[in-house]
């Protein structure tokens, strides 16, 4: 029995090291004001609830909403061009799953090129 306890105690630092580096994601902001505009194209995003994406700066408590993945990625590549912080400050990117419409972390999503399904901007 003692042997098993020591094995667990020896593995514990390894497990902590593996998972400690992974930052916990906060929940996405779910409330979008009716007058909220996409910082990239200027469209009203609340009209396109199924396509809304968001970028969050948790340190500054700021959220930017977009009318689709395309504008989210344009913003992510050069956020300062659209009034955002440096790219390293964008801690979270969120998109909606196409079928369930639930928020998922954008870095975990699978994106399809050449689909016949178009978002609000084509």
Could you say what each language-model-derived stretch is?
Residues 1-4:
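N-terminal secretory signal peptides that target proteins for export/translocation
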Residues 7-8, 25, 101:
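A generic signature of intrinsically disordered, low-complexity regions enriched in glycine/proline
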Residues 8-18:
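Bacterial N-terminal signal peptides
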Residues 12-13, 59, 104:
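Short linear sequence motifs
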Residues 20-26:
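Sec/Tat signal peptide C-region and signal peptidase I cleavage site
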Residues 26-85:
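N-terminal secretory signal peptides
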Residues 85-122:
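Thiol/selenol-based redox catalytic cores and closely related redox-interacting motifs
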């Amino acid at each position: 029995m003692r042997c098993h306890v020591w094995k667990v105690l020896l593995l514990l630092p390894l497990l902590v090291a593996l998972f400690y580096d992974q930052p916990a994601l906060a929940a996405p902001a779910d409330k979008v004001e009716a007058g909220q505009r996409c910082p990239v194209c200027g469209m009203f995003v609340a009209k396109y609830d199924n396509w809304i994406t968001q970028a969050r700066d948790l340190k500054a408590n700021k959220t930017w909403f977009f009318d689709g993945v395309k504008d989210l990625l344009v913003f992510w590549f050069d956020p300062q061009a659209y009034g955002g912080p440096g790219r390293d400050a964008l801690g979270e990117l969120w998109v909606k799953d196409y079928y369930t419409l639930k928020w998922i972390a954008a870095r975990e999503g699978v994106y399809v090129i050449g689909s016949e399904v178009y978002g609000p901007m084509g």
